[in-house]
């Protein structure tokens, strides 16, 4: 084994080892493996092989361990099922648009500029900049990189994220216009793209320089602030960008009203009216989920889906248990409105609603009108949040710009008035703001009315003047009007820039727009200018013409947001990327700053020029309005009547629509010619590359790394488009950076060819086969492990993704290199995500995003406190605590604890490990005031009663069955012969004794291995729960614990193992159980379908951190946590054991525990010798519990005991909770209780499974990375496992983390609360079973004839045990109840008088 350079490389190389080693491929050696631990000649020998020649798993026998149910387990473990495919995802028949893709400008991406087509100023700018290209370095093989230099961790490892290339000049500035990513299709003409990019960079540099100079001038002009100015005035000046502090006249707590309330503060100063609201951080949990009907794009039929509103995306799924494969999504970041539909009938509220985005309108139908309202409200909240990427909302407008104020009553308990404000002196666009006051509304209205009237004469004279003065004050005021600052905590210059520039909800640093005529063309009634020029102003007349519905998002981008896509910003000029999408090839001769305004039906080309040195480029652009009106010459007079202007605009509206349609048709007619001219051969190469397969890695700027194979230079130049298309495909935020892509097959029902995307936090897949729409979005935090497997098809190479609580995913690659590279990349990202989560970096990063807004909010409160004092502030603070639009929909937990004490019986059979969890549970029930009782084997009675728990005996000691297994081997001919003679009587005794032990019970909790509980609960008419230590409920996530395959087989195999096991086990005992039901319980014969055991409430007593709850588990199945019985606190260790541990610590040696229980092997001496040699070879100290020496295998080959060296100390017994807390690693057989104890102690666990559920828990330990599962036990394998478990820092840290999580759980308390919560549901099932059984309460023979009894037995009532609530179920229950009463009336009176002792009749429930 070659030496490794560091920990990460060692793990990766171990993972990618082509040779299948005896240790799992999911583990990596922590450091250089000593030469003594190399494989020897015994590497393929298993010294735990049982006696006899009967083969089973891997050619060896399996053993009964801990549970009676092991006899049936061999059926599952020997079964061979090959159904390994999942169902294909459903589709609603919609087809997605594929607009044109465009080039993007990113930081670190080189851009070639054709300077011949630019003006001299542009050429000089572009020549000065040059081509700046970030030095990405040589990537080499991906798995060679260490964690420290991984791109996910670089922001945390270094303060400098981007460094300039020393070979070039200044680094190219970042161009990040407000944008929307589009899907992958051809891009526009490269020449025009480069022209626009060069102009955009030039404008950005110029505006940055001007802003800096302006900021310096303003600072110098202001000088020091007046010390007499109040802190509140100073704070408002900084927050809203005023020229000087303005005295605060009055302030009110109010709400900005649109379709919802945004609560904040109104500050009235000498010159402005300001509104400020602090927004809480967006939640990452699902806001709302449930079933809805969705209409297709072209198909008017509604299809039912499961919808989940989480973050900014509304996703819908064909199967609610398969949440990694959405059928589609609605990206609400581009949402415009959410509103209810028109009622179809008078007097009935509508159930339909629609969501309008910039792309299309989605139509939904809820099950009720109330549900539709709730969905609309939730969607409106999300749309509002998505338009506010910052943590605060600010509005300020000069008092001189207010036209009027009028009352607008909305509700009786609040005062609402409307303020109309002129947006701009150039355009006369008018905005309306509604403010609602719950207190002091009349006072605020009168105050503002007087203030506005005082300014009315001044406002009129200003607007009627030929040309207003463009003083710095007026320019500054005009720029600050009605601007929303969505980012807080920045410098004042930055705040001014964000106010004057675009502040749309997609103005993020690296989000690039890709617009096309197909996407710009809207079916709704928005302006046709959107097809080629984005309008940014609005008016009241315009709203009345378009009749657009307002929504909460209107308050962000003013009223014109509903006549234009919200993805466009508020820039005075369109960005280069928008402009490029609006032009075609014959427009390349124009300057990139050319605009098209349709005012009189003609196109007017106007160049943006910088007129003089005193006017900045941005201010020059501000003089020209891009609104839907006439193009005005700056020297002409403006009309003094806004109403006349609005009428003119209304009249020109048809001409605008016609001109826009002509532009749209002209652009589309030349689109194909542009594609063929610029991308003639590129598409052939890309399509061929797609089917050939391969991989690509992307750098910091999401450009293709230079050392990837088959990289097209043009792809490198356009590399940042990959990340944008990736985010557009899966509706991911701009912060999700693309890292690598692969072409592979996803195995579900059939192999589905597509593309794998690996990003910082997500693993995504998208099908590329025409006619398929499968998408997968899998968070990396949900991935437990990644393993290599053989492909399902010859010549292909498999990769298995193991997911928490979900079935495995199978991918096939054409080449092993691509598969290995994908495995390495995923492992690196898993390590990075794990590192960031453990170190708290993710939380810190998220917290930093809101720190600035919180600080600003706190400083504002402090300033208010300073000015007004505590008494004046208290009413305002109290009202500000209410956030009606951000309320938490989750209700508080209700206490379901029953008022009376319950008699609870716990029925279980098996070994000590089966009884111990019930003792812990009953101790918790005793503390709750209940009267528990354990019904199990008589040998455990002293142990149970020692804890103050009542006891009832159950026959059928499993020792007899264990003896049969030991003496005959599992499922040999002699075993079947003896079991057929003795096992039937064993079951009869078990059933009869269990029926007697469960009398006088109000609730029955049973292990499924006891077999009798569900029938006893039906006879007693009492609620029934199940509890077990291993998975027993049908799921696609895990196989049955007794049917774990050698290799991953997929969800279909996992599910069918439960179906097979249930049927095999029931068939074996059905005859005896039905006979017992008739003779002793007085019940009819039943079947597996009639019992419906999968509807029974189930409690699993293992940790959800060890076995996460599968996504397809129903609500009544709960994983509660381990039920530990802590007995170690009262145990005193022997002196020899304490001295052995103390001596090992002094010597600096690791201590391991080895104990396999009472197993039977063919050569116990050889096994003992193997353990001794492995311990010595690994150089550890061992505490040994040698159970296999108690019962030798072949008496003829008996050998003397092997003497133990001083490094090994043998014990007979010790409490696990005490012993495992004093060791460094544990080695055992993998029983449920022992595994839980070692994991709780936080020590690495080595499992050598022998039988049944031990294979399942061994695989879980390995998947979690906290231990090793050995398939064979020999010196080579065992010594290496011991050394790795005691030296692997990765494994030790993971085990400690898992142990801390398990110790923080309270499984008993959780189980008791689950019992309380599901008790009413269990009572409902008990009532339905009693009705369906149609028997009296006494187990007395019926008076019916044999023919009548047989007829009743043939009744198919498998659908009768369903939920109560639907009309059909109610009718069915009524008929069954009537039939039961009729049957009871036919019985003799003496039968009705008899009842089982302790039964209280049908009213017990």
Curated annotation (Swiss-Prot):
- Cite the PH domain residue spans from the record: 285-384
* One GO term (biological process): sterol metabolic process
EC code: 2.4.1.-, 2.4.1.173
> Which enzyme type, at the first EC level?
transferase
Question: SUPFAM superfamilies annotated for this entry?
Answer: PH domain-like, UDP-Glycosyltransferase/glycogen phosphorylase
**Would the keyword Transcription be found if you checked this record's keyword annotation?**
no
Compositionally biased region (Acidic residues)? 1349-1367
Q: Where is the composition biased (Low complexity)?
A: 116-126, 1332-1348
Where does this protein have compositionally biased stretches of type Basic and acidic residues? 1-16, 95-105, 570-589, 606-624
Task: Give any Pfam family that matches.
Answer: PH
Q: Does the keyword Cell division apply?
A: no
Q: Which domain of life is it from?
A: Eukaryota
Query: What residues bind UDP-alpha-D-glucose, as annotated?
Result: 911-912, 914, 1214, 1216, 1229, 1233-1234, 1253-1254
Q: What GO cellular-component annotations does this UniProt entry give?
A: phagophore assembly site membrane
The similarity annotation says: Belongs to the glycosyltransferase 28 family.
The free-text domain remark for this protein reads: The GRAM and PH domains are required for the localization of ATG26 to the preautophagosomal structure (PAS) and are involved in autophagy.
Q: What is this protein called?
A: Sterol 3-beta-glucosyltransferase
Q: Say which species the protein is native to.
A: Aspergillus fumigatus (strain ATCC MYA-4609 / CBS 101355 / FGSC A1100 / Af293)
């Amino acid at each position: 084994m070659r030496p490794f350079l560091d920990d990460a490389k060692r793990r990766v190389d171990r993972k990618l080892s082509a040779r299948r080693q005896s240790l799992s491929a999911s583990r990596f050696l922590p450091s250089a493996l000593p030469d003594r631990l190399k494989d020897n000649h015994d590497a393929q020998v298993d010294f735990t092989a049982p006696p006899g020649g009967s083969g089973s798993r891997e050619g060896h026998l399996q053993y009964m361990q801990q549970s009676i149910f092991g006899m049936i387990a061999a059926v599952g473990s020997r079964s061979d099922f090959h159904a390994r495919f999942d169902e294909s995802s459903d589709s609603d028949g919609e087809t997605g648009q594929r607009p044109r893709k465009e080039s993007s400008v990113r930081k670190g991406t080189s851009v070639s500029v054709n300077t011949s087509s630019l003006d001299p100023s542009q050429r000089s700018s572009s020549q000065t900049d040059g081509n700046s290209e970030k030095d990405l370095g040589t990537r080499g093989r991906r798995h060679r990189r260490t964690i420290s230099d991984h791109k996910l961790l670089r922001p945390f490892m270094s303060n400098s994220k981007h460094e300039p290339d020393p070979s070039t000049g200044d680094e190219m500035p970042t161009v990040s216009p407000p944008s929307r990513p589009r899907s992958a299709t051809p891009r526009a003409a490269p020449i025009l793209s480069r022209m626009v990019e060069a102009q955009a960079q030039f404008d950005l540099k110029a505006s940055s320089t001007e802003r800096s100079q302006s900021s310096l001038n303003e600072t110098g002009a202001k000088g020091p602030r007046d010390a007499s100015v109040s802190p509140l005035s100073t704070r408002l000046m900084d927050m809203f960008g005023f020229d000087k502090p303005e005295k605060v006249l009055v302030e009110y707590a109010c709400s900005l009203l649109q379709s919802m309330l945004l609560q904040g503060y109104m500050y009235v100063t000498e010159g402005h009216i300001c509104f400020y609201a602090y927004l809480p951080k967006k939640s990452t949990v699902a806001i709302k989920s449930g079933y809805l009907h969705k209409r297709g794009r072209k198909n008017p039929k509604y299809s039912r889906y499961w919808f989940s509103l989480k973050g900014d995306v509304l996703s819908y799924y064909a199967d609610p248990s398969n949440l990694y494969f959405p059928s589609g999504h609605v990206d609400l970041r581009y949402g415009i409105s959410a509103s209810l539909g028109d009622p179809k009938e008078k007097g009935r509220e509508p159930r339909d609603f629609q969501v309008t985005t910039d792309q299309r309108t989605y139509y939904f139908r809820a099950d009720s009108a109330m549900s539709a309202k709730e969905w609309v409200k939730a969607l409106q909240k999300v749309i509002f949040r998505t338009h506010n990427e910052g943590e605060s909302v600010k509005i300020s407008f000069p008092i001189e710009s207010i036209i009027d104020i009028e009352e607008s009553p909305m509700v009786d308990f609040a005062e609402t008035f409307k303020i109309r404000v002129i947006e701009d002196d150039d355009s006369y666009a008018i905005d309306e703001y509604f403010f609602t006051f719950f207190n002091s509304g009349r006072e605020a209205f009168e105050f503002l009315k007087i203030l506005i009237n005082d300014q009315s004469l001044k406002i009129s004279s200003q607007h009627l003047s030929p040309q207003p003065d463009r003083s710095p004050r007026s320019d500054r005021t005009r720029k600050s009007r009605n601007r929303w600052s969505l980012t807080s905590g920045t410098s004042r210059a930055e705040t001014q820039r964000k106010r004057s520039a675009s502040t749309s909800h997609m103005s993020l640093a690296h989000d690039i727009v890709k617009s096309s005529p197909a996407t710009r063309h809207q079916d709704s009634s928005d302006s046709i200018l959107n097809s080629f020029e984005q309008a940014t102003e609005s008016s009241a007349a315009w709203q009345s013409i378009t009749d657009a519905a307002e929504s909460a998002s209107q308050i962000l981008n003013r009223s014109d947001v509903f006549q234009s896509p919200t993805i466009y910003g508020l820039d005075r000029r369109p960005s280069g990327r928008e402009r490029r999408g609006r032009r075609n090839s014959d427009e390349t001769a124009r300057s990139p700053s050319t605009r098209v305004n349709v005012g009189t039906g003609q196109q007017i080309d106007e160049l943006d020029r910088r007129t003089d040195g005193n006017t900045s480029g941005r201010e020059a652009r501000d003089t020209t309005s891009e609104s839907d009106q006439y193009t005005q010459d700056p020297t002409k007079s403006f009309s003094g009547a806004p109403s006349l202007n609005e009428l003119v605009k209304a009249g020109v509206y048809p001409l605008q629509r016609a001109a826009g349609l002509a532009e749209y048709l002209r652009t589309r007619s030349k689109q194909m010619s542009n594609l063929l001219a610029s991308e003639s051969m590129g598409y052939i190469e890309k399509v061929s590359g797609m089917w050939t397969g391969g991989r690509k890695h992307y750098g910091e700027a999401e450009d293709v790394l230079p050392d990837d194979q088959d990289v097209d230079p043009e792809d490198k130049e356009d590399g940042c488009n990959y990340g944008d298309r990736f985010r557009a495909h899966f509706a991911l935020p701009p912060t999700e950076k693309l890292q690598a892509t692969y072409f592979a097959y996803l195995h579900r029902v059939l192999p589905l060819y597509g593309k794998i995307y690996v990003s910082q936090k997500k693993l995504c897949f998208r099908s590329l086969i025409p006619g398929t729409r499968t998408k997968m979005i899998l968070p990396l935090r949900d991935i437990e492990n990644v393993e290599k497997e053989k492909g399902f098809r010859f010549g292909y190479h498999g990769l298995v993704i193991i997911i928490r609580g979900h079935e495995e995913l199978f991918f096939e690659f054409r080449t092993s290199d691509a598969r290995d590279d994908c495995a390495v990349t995923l492992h690196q990202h898993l390590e990075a995500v794990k590192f960031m989560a453990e170190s708290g970096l993710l939380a810190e990063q998220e917290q930093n995003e809101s720190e600035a807004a919180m600080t600003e909010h706190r400083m504002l409160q402090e300033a208010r406190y300073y000015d007004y004092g505590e008494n004046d502030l208290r009413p305002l603070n109290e009202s500000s605590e209410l956030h009606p639009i951000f309320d938490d929909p989750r209700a508080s937990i209700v206490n379901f604890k029953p008022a009376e004490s319950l008699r609870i019986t716990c029925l279980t059979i098996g070994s000590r490990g089966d009884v111990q969890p019930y003792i812990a549970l009953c101790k918790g029930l005793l503390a709750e005031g209940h009267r528990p009782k354990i019904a199990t084997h008589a040998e455990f009675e002293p142990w149970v009663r020692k804890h103050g728990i009542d006891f009832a005996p159950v026959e059928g000691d499993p020792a007899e069955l264990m003896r049969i297994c030991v003496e005959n081997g599992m499922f040999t001919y002699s075993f079947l012969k003896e079991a057929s003679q003795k096992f039937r009587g064993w079951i009869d005794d078990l059933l009869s004794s269990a029926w007697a032990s469960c009398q006088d019970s109000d609730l029955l909790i049973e292990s499924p291995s006891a077999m009798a509980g569900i029938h006893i609960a039906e006879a007693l008419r009492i609620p029934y729960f199940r509890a077990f230590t291993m998975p027993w409920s049908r799921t696609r996530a895990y196989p049955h614990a007794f049917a774990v395959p050698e290799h991953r087989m997929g969800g279909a195999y996992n599910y069918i193992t439960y179906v097979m096991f249930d049927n095999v086990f029931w068939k074996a005992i059905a005859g005896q159980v039905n006979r017992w039901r008739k003779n002793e319980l007085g019940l009819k014969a039943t079947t597996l379908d009639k019992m419906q055991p999968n509807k029974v409430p189930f409690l699993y007593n293992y940790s959800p951190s060890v076995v996460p709850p599968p996504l397809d588990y129903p609500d009544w199945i709960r994983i509660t946590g381990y039920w530990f019985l802590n007995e170690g606190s009262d145990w005193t260790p022997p002196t020899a054991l304490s001295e052995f541990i103390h001596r090992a610590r002094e010597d600096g040696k690791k201590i391991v525990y080895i104990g396999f229980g009472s197993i039977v092997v063919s050569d116990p001496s050889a096994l003992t010798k193997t353990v001794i040699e492995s311990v010595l070879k690994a150089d550890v100290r061992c505490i040994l519990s040698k159970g296999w020496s108690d019962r030798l295998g072949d008496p003829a080959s008996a050998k003397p005991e092997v003497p133990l060296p001083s490094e090994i100390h043998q014990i007979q017994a010790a409490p696990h909770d005490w012993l495992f807390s004093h060791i460094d690693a544990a080695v055992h057989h993998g029983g449920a209780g022992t595994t839980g104890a070692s994991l709780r102690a936080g020590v690495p666990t080595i499992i050598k499974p022998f039988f049944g559920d031990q294979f399942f828990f061994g695989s879980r330990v390995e998947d979690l990375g906290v231990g090793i599962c050995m398939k064979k036990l020999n010196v080579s394998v065992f010594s290496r496992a011991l050394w790795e478990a005691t030296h692997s820092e990765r494994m030790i840290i993971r085990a400690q983390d898992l142990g801390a999580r398990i110790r923080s759980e309270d499984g008993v308390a959780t189980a008791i609360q689950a019992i309380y919560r599901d008790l009413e549901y269990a009572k409902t099932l008990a009532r339905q079973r009693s009705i369906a059984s149609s028997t009296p309460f006494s187990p007395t023979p019926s008076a019916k004839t044999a023919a009548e009894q047989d007829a009743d037995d043939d009744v198919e009532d498998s659908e009768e045990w369903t939920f109560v609530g639907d009309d059909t179920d109610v009718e069915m229950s009524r008929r069954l109840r009537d039939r039961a009463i009729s049957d009871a009336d036919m019985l003799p009176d003496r039968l009705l008088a008899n009842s089982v002792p302790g039964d209280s009749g049908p009213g017990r429930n």
